[in-house]
Amino acid sequence: MDTELLKTFLEVSRTRHFGRAAESLYLTQSAVSFRIRQLENQLGVNLFTRHRNNIRLTAAGEKLLPYAETLMSTWQAARKEVAHTSRHNEFSIGASASLWECMLNQWLGRLYKNQDAHTGLQFEARIAQRQSLVKQLHERQLDLLITTEAPKMDEFSSQLLGYFTLALYTSAPSKLKGDLNYLRLEWGPDFQQHEAGLIGADEVPILTTSSAELAQQQIAMLNGCTWLPVSWARKKGGLHTVVDSTTLSRPLYAIWLQNSDKNALIRDLLKINVLDEVY
């Protein structure tokens, strides 16, 4: 039996009006009437008596009512349980493109190597801007956010994972800032507050991107420089620090909902080092 037919039957019995039932179910009145006829044909009985606007349950309808309520309640419970089981095996992690490319990609590999403790766990690596990911976290569409900024909402829990160092890199040795075009790699709003002092107040980026891979590939072609994590740049090779530049230490945080049903799992996963070099 189609559960939608029972749902329609229950709504008509509640409102005693085909028009109001149609509005509640976001259907046309003719669609509601058609569903009731289908159910009556399947059961071989009339479920309602219709006298103008006076709609009443027949004796057969009265007998069906408690069974329909039980069936719909059981169906809803089954759907919820199945959905919870499916969702329970999924774990979504969100971060910016640059964080995934420079450090989280390696961490994800370590999570899979340690899957014995979490057999069957399905990871989703989600890439987006921080503002979008915070919204997803708040709406329970994301389990864990990795970011360079501490949370600003009371309903979030957080853990400082460590620090990493950014340095200004270019593709050739012995270069000065004044000789190079600036490529802005987005490391968060709080980094941008210091950016002008680190680069030069009048320096206009020739390119802005959230991808470290893209920025690294473009600096040679654009005679440019960009801020990259030191450990990642060393592994890449072929990169040189700009002579008259400094380094900058950045924090890395894990953020999740305080009342998340995956609190224990999150803390367990965070025991596996996110950063290759933690200090």
UniProtKB/Swiss-Prot annotation:
Record-annotated DNA-binding residue ranges: 18-37
Gene3D superfamilies membership: Periplasmic binding protein-like II, Winged helix-like DNA-binding domain superfamily/Winged helix DNA-binding domain
Listed PROSITE patterns: HTH_LYSR
Pfam families: HTH_1 (PF00126), LysR_substrate (PF03466)
Domain HTH lysR-type: 1-58
Key words, A-Z: DNA-binding, Repressor, Transcription, Transcription regulation
GO MF, one annotated term: DNA-binding transcription factor activity
GO biological process: negative regulation of DNA-templated transcription
Its biological purpose: Negatively regulates the transcription of the flagellar master operon flhDC by binding to the upstream region of the operon.
Entry's family note: Belongs to the LysR transcriptional regulatory family.
Name assigned to this protein: HTH-type transcriptional regulator HdfR
Lineage of origin: Bacteria, Pseudomonadati, Pseudomonadota, Gammaproteobacteria, Enterobacterales
Name of encoding gene: hdfR
